[in-house]
């Protein structure tokens, strides 16, 4: 004698099972909202940087900071690492360019616009990481953070050693320009 057959699952159970199958895992990395939104970010930022920080009125002596960016950080196909690197660069750029010691000839409105844009993109990148990954992001990847911290620390020492002169800030402007180009390269990796 055949046993009793199980009743078919209600439609709600089928819908929930389908939803679970189609939903990405909680630890999956998803930065898809940034892809179209950020395609012109670096170039818009470069324009704001040009508007904000015109060249100094007097020529600057040839001075180079001994700061070298760890370009190996850009050679990645890992979208999450690219996003972490871009986020860390943006945070340091924001901290540096929001300094109260920026030169008087820099245009306040353009600087404010650039800082707003940086903050906006920092916020969007932070949202790419799951809430439980925020703690992990603050700790690592350790070498990535140390390399970028060292690079921006070198820039800060350069500014201090040159008493925050307009010429030293002009060098920082050039470094920021290079950072926006690096961010553009990283956002291409995130696509």
Curated annotation (Swiss-Prot):
GO terms (BP aspect): defense response to virus; immune response
GO CC annotations on file: extracellular space
Molecular function per GO: cytokine activity; cytokine receptor binding
InterPro entries from the UniProt entry: 4_helix_cytokine-like_core, Interferon_alpha/beta/delta
PROSITE patterns in the record: INTERFERON_A_B_D
Position of the signal peptide: 1-30
Disulfide bonds: 31-128, 60-154, 67-167
Subcellular location: Secreted
Principal location listed in the UniProt entry: secreted
Keywords from the UniProt entry: Antiviral defense, Cytokine, Disulfide bond, Glycoprotein, Secreted, Signal
Induction record: By viral infection.
Glycosylation sites: 77, 161
Function: Has antiviral activities.
Family of the protein in this entry: Belongs to the alpha/beta interferon family.
This protein's name: Interferon
Encoding gene, per UniProt annotation: IFN
């Amino acid at each position: 004698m055949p046993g009793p057959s199980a009743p078919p699952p209600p439609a709600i159970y089928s819908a929930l099972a389908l939803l679970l199958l189609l939903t990405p895992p909680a630890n999956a990395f998803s930065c898809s909202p940034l892809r179209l939104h950020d395609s012109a970010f670096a170039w818009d930022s470069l324009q704001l940087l040009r508007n904000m920080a015109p060249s100094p009125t007097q020529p600057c002596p040839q001075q180079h900071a001994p700061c070298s960016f760890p370009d190996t950080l850009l050679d990645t196909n890992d979208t999450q690492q690219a996003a972490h690197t871009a986020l860390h660069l943006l945070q340091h750029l924001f901290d540096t360019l929001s300094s109260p010691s920026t030169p008087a000839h820099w245009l306040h409105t353009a600087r404010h616009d650039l800082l707003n844009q940086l903050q906006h993109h920092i916020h969007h990148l932070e949202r790419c990481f799951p809430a439980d990954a925020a703690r992990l992001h603050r700790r690592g990847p350790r070498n990535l953070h140390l390399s970028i911290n060292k690079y921006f620390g070198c820039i800060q020492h350069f500014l201090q050693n040159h008493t925050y002169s307009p010429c030293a800030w002009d060098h920082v402007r050039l470094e920021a320009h290079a950072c926006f180009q690096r961010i553009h390269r990283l956002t291409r990796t995130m696509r």
